[in-house]
Amino acid sequence: MLGMVAQWMGLEGQCANAVAPLLVSTEQGRCKSTFCSILLPEELQHFYIDKFDLSSESGCEQKLSLFGLINMDEFDRYSVRNMATLKNLMQLKKLTFRKSHRSYYSQLPRIASFIGTSNQKELLTDTTGSRRFLCVEVNIDKQGFMLL
């Protein structure tokens, strides 16, 4: 959470917030996605998104400049081939792109941080390591959680 706020404030220095917690539980209905969706207060909910399609890299880059928290819900659905793209996006500090019908490029700061959820424990497939993902096994007490 500190890294996310530092990213928003532009305090990350030369590095972007490139670590994403992955909430993991083999049981469905543990409110992992619900928990992610309420991390931001109501006033900032328009900066939260849980639709992140890696097939359009330019669309992904635009979301990095528009949203504060991107939930990669059901993280295990992302293919091994998409992981290289995702890792690259996670380390970007600034975004350079050309808007439609413009002849020049614009630079925008990246404000987005990532979080993810999965019902699979064996979801990191990179044989060289996965330093960008911090898997956290959760056992959320649904009854207590729903009181929030």
Task: Give names to the regions the model predicted.
Residues 59-65, 99-117:
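AAA+/SF3 P-loop NTPase mechanochemical coupling elements
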Residues 83-106:
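Conserved catalytic/switch belt of AAA+ P-loop NTPases
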